[in-house]
Structure formats: C-alpha cells, structure tokens
A protein has these predicted regions:
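Short, structured active-site-proximal loop/turn typified by the sulfatase FGly-forming signature C/S-X-P-X-R
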Residues: 36-83
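A long, amphipathic alpha-helix that forms part
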Residues: 158-170, 187-228
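Active-site neighborhoods of enzymes that stabilize oxyanions during catalysis
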Residues: 261-313
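His/Asp/Glu-rich, glycine-adjacent segments
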Residues: 77-195, 288-289
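Loop/turn elements at helix/coil->beta-strand transitions in domains of secreted/extracellular proteins
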Residues: 21-26, 52-56, 82, 124-130, ...
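Structural recognition of the beta-strand scaffold that forms the well-ordered cores
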Residues: 25-29, 36, 57-60, 73-75, ...
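Metal-dependent active-site segment of extracytoplasmic phospho-/sulfohydrolases and closely related
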Residues: 27, 45, 207-249
Length: 313
C-alpha cells in the first residue's frame, strides 16, 4: 500500500511539473491584411513584434483566395480540394445543400467541413482550445468543438474580444486553453468598401497596429506571459478593382440556363444538361481578361479540382 501511495504522489508531482511547463499559443488573424500594408504607414507595434520574433515576406493563399477557404486551410494544413470548404458560398452536391457564411444553420453544420482542424486534433489529445470567431469553430467537426467558442457577431468590439481571450488565459489550469484562435474582420472590411489604397484603409491599418499593441500589452501581464507564443496571420491580400474591369457574364451568354454561385474573381457554373453547359462554356470563351475552365482542366498548381463540390465550369 505504501509503494502505491508513493507512486501516486510521484505521478501527480510529475504531472504538475509538466503542466507548469506547458506552452501556450495565441493565433491571431487580421482578415485581408496585405503583406505590404506594413510598409504603407507607421506600424510600431507590428515592427516591435517582428523585431523580437520572426517575420515572413508574406502568405501565398490557397485558391480560391477567399476568407473561409483560407482560414480553414490555415487550421487544417490542407488545400481546398482536400477539405471541401471550396468558397465563402457554394452548393455542396454531396449534401444537397447550400453553404453560405451568413447562414447560421450551415455554418454550424459540421458535415460541410472536411479534414481535421488543429483544435479537433488538440481536443482529442486532451489539450483545451478556444476560439473567438475562427472559421469552422462554430460547428461540431467530427463531433468536436473547441472547449470555448463564440457564435460570430461582427458587432462585438475588438477590445471586448481581446479581454475575453486574456480572461481565458487566466482561467485555472484545469480549464485554461493552451491554443486560442482570435479573428478580426479588419482591415478586410474597410479595404473592400473603400479600396486597399484609400486613406480610410491606411487609417484602419494604424488602428489594427493599435489593436496589436493592446494584445501585446495585456498578454505581457499574464501569469503565463513567458510561455505564450503569438502568431499573427492573414488569409489573403487585396487589389484595386475599377468599374471598367467588371465583367457582366449575361452579356455573353444566357445565364438563366445555368446555376451560378460565387462572386468576385471566381464564379462557378453548373447545369443539369452537359449540352447546355457546353454551350455556355463556348459562349464564355469570348470573355476579355478572364479564363474559363472545365473542372478537369483546372491547373494542378491550384489544387482545386479533386473534390465533388467543385462545379464543372
């Protein structure tokens, strides 16, 4: 009996030492933060972070360069054709359902999300995770949620999000997440509305630098500050688009014959009849400054062909 008691004490002490040496990760995404934004205006807090850590030249997003596919690729390490979240909005032929980022029911349906995101892997290993608005965390993927997660609400002030994250890192060890994922919709929202080179976007970049400063200051006061690793990422960049660059597909073909999904630089076309789709495909060969592909001909380098949800054109 004495030997068993001593063994249990040793195990408990070892577990405590291991837990106290655990590292923590805060993964922060600032949507649409183009790599060269850091050169367009003063960003002292980002500069400080880079000077005391490691900075990459930029991120090469997966195709398509949209928010939902790229955030989920960051979380899974998979290309879009592998995880199946093929766009912000799409029709999932395997589920016979539409997915759209503004539809609460679909966003929280784990069947849309393939692969295994990092929080699922961690939770299965007994590592607690938390998310403030990261794509996919609102769904039970393979039956697993982060230990702590939030339903998306863009109106939640950035400071409130930061305070919640710091509170999570201050929880008792038994409830404290070791991986926290935090999402901000800026400067993407401002860039889309006013353009990436606008004065308002520059102002927003400066604001996000201030947000970064707040995160660093508050994180530095945590009891786990010396064990906290911060990663700052973005999902894609942005470029100027002018009205004379907009292409109206209906000028070139009768869109009533096909089902269209997607928007912006990428549009998907499908139809019940292959003959109809072939006619539309041939019509669209006239498009200026655009390329039309059959699914089978999509370039290998885009890793955007081998999933049943990707439409034929």
């Amino acid at each position: 009996m004495l030997k068993i008691s001593i063994y249990l004490i040793i195990v408990n002490i070892s577990a405590l030492i291991y837990a106290e040496n655990d590292q923590y990760v805060l993964l922060v995404s600032m949507d649409g933060f183009r790599a060269d934004y850091l050169e367009t205006t003063d960003t002292p807090n980002f500069d400080k972070l880079a000077n005391n850590g490691v900075r990459s030249e930029g991120l090469k997003p997966v195709f398509i360069s949209k928010t939902f596919p790229n955030h989920y690729s960051i979380a899974t390490g998979m290309y879009v054709e592998n995880h199946g979240l093929i766009a912000n909005s799409f029709f999932a032929t395997d589920l016979d359902k539409y997915y759209t980022m503004r539809d609460r029911e679909t966003v929280e349906n784990g069947n849309f999300y393939g692969g295994e995101p990092i929080w699922v892997t961690a939770e299965r290993q007994g590592v607690k995770t938390a998310s403030y608005f990261w794509v996919g965390t609102e769904a039970a993927i393979a039956g697993v949620h982060p230990s702590i997660w939030k339903r998306y609400d863009q109106k939640v002030p950035f400071d409130d999000r930061i305070d919640s994250v710091m509170a999570w890192f201050s929880l008792p060890m038994s409830h404290r997440p070791r991986l926290v994922m935090l999402y901000f919709h800026e400067p993407d929202w401002t860039g889309h509305k006013y353009g990436p080179s606008s004065a308002k976007t520059v102002d927003q970049i400066q604001r996000m630098d201030g947000i970064m400063g707040t995160i660093m200051d508050k994180a530095g006061k945590l009891s786990i500050a010396d064990k906290l690793n911060m990663l700052i990422v973005s999902d894609h960049g942005m470029t100027e688009v002018h009205s004379n660059q907009i292409i109206d597909l209906s000028v070139y073909t009768d869109l009533s014959r096909v089902k269209t999904t997607g928007a912006g630089p990428t549009v998907f076309l499908s139809a019940e009849s292959t003959k109809t789709l072939t006619t539309v495909y041939n019509d669209l060969q006239q498009l200026p400054n655009a390329q039309v592909y059959w699914k089978r001909d999509i370039p290998d380098r885009w890793h955007y062909r081998n999933h049943e949800r990707i439409p034929e054109v």
